[in-house]
């Protein structure tokens, strides 16, 4: 459920980024996050940075003309401290690194809505046993609901060394904590127990739920390089290593739904959320590069790019599956293994100082997440996006800076994969996925 950037990763570490997303080659008070090797070129002193973001909007799915929507209202704080000396600097940061907040779908999701259509498809297959009547013709899941949360926090501690007047390098260690939650209910309506001629029931039950939390700790390293090619041109690069996260699930699930005596519940489709299950879902490594160029003393432009090594990370590729012996042959319902290509994004930004105390920021960013359609489901759909941002920078004196920014994420709408996943059920349609998110941000930096 990440917004912007790639699969789980975000890049909205600081408020200034949302106004000018081309931060990788800049040297400013946000560089401690994006170009740490460059902070040694700032004025000497100890800096304290505090920021707050508020992301609002919605994420939604559509299935057979019905909309399943969750509103987003997610605050995201960030903190940083760094000390700049003549030939070195120390820095510490804390804040979000991945995830997409808390989303509550009060009317269910596409994955619950499709259950009624799957049952209708099963009913068609059972007609030879039920007097040519579709016993599930009125099956629906009205009253179902779902809530999911994906949040990751990081803290990074590092040092910068100035090699000469042009070149500086940085190295840091990073600690990450991730939490992923799923709380959902499935209510089946218009169904009843169906006896089997061989004893027992062909079908029984009408309710399933899950309440599970997955948590993990991980660590990584961060390496940086900054090169001041000329007085006006600055070049920089940063590498954030893969963070290995072995999530462990803690929770409960229940289902009284059975088909052919085989239980059917959320754990069949989300095995990573079964209590006690351990599944790797890493944060991929990132290679970030950028440049900034002072066109005039008051106007700076920047270009940034990020590359996400998704293929090298393990990312919940387990697919759920059930196989039910039936008189007409085995009934199989199975998930698809999530697939990912590497992701990338490119940003162009500008900063123009129109007075000694005020500057205006602007930028555009395109993100290709690398997520393939097989990865789209109720708990994850990382869509490609274009982001527009702008803001103001206010310096009341030489040691104080306020930043006020706003940005909007325009996401591509994509279709799902039910046509492949449930290919044997003509009653099933394909869902579509979409998002719309706006972020409002403020930060304060003080140099002592």
Region roles according to the model:
Residues 46, 87-90, 166-169, 232-235, ...:
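Repeated loop/turn-to-beta-strand initiation elements of outer-membrane beta-barrel proteins
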């Amino acid at each position: 459920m990440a917004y912007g950037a790639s699969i789980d990763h975000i890049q909205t570490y600081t408020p200034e980024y949302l106004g000018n997303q081309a931060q990788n080659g800049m040297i400013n008070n946000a560089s401690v996050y994006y170009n740490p090797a460059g902070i040694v070129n700032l004025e000497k002193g100890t800096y304290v940075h505090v920021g707050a973001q508020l992301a609002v909007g919605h994420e939604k799915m559509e299935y057979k003309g019905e909309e399943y929507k969750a509103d987003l209202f997610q605050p995201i704080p960030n903190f940083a401290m760094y000390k700049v000396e003549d030939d070195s600097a120390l820095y510490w940061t804390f804040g979000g690194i991945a995830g997409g907040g808390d989303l509550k779908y009060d009317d269910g999701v596409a994955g619950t809505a499709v259950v009624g259509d799957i049952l209708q498809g099963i009913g068609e297959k059972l007609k030879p046993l039920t007097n040519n009547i579709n016993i599930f013709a009125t099956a629906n899941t009205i009253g179902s609901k779902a809530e999911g949360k994906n949040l990751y926090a990081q803290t990074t501690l590092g040092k910068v060394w100035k090699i000469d007047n042009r070149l500086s390098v940085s190295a840091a260690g990073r600690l990450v904590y991730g939490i992923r939650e799923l709380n959902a209910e499935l209510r089946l309506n218009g169904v009843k127990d169906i006896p089997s001629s061989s004893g027992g029931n062909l079908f029984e039950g009408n309710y399933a739920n899950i309440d599970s939390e997955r948590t993990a700790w991980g660590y990584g390293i961060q390496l940086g390089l900054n090169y001041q090619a000329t007085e006006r041109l600055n070049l920089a690069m940063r590498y954030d290593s893969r963070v290995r996260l072995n999530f462990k699930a803690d929770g409960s699930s229940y289902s009284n739904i059975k088909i052919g005596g085989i239980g059917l519940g959320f754990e069949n489709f989300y095995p990573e959320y079964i209590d006690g299950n351990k599944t790797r879902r890493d944060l991929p490594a990132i290679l970030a590069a950028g440049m900034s160029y002072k066109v005039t003393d008051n106007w700076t432009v920047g270009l940034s790019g990020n590359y996400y090594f998704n293929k090298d990370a393990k990312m919940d590729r387990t697919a759920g599956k059930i196989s039910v012996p039936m008189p007409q042959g085995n009934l199989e319902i199975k998930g698809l293994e999530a697939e990912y290509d590497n992701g990338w994004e490119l940003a162009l930004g500008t900063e123009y100082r129109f007075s000694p105390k005020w500057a205006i920021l602007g930028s555009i960013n395109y993100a290709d997440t690398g997520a393939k359609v097989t990865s789209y489901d109720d708990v994850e759909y990382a869509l490609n996006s274009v982001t527009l941002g702008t803001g103001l920078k206010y310096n009341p004196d030489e040691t104080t800076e306020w930043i006020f920014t706003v940005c909007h994420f325009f996401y591509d709408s994509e279709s799902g994969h039910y046509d492949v996943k449930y290919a044997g059920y003509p009653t099933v349609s394909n869902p579509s996925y979409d998002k719309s998110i706006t972020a409002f941000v403020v930060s304060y930096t003080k140099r002592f």
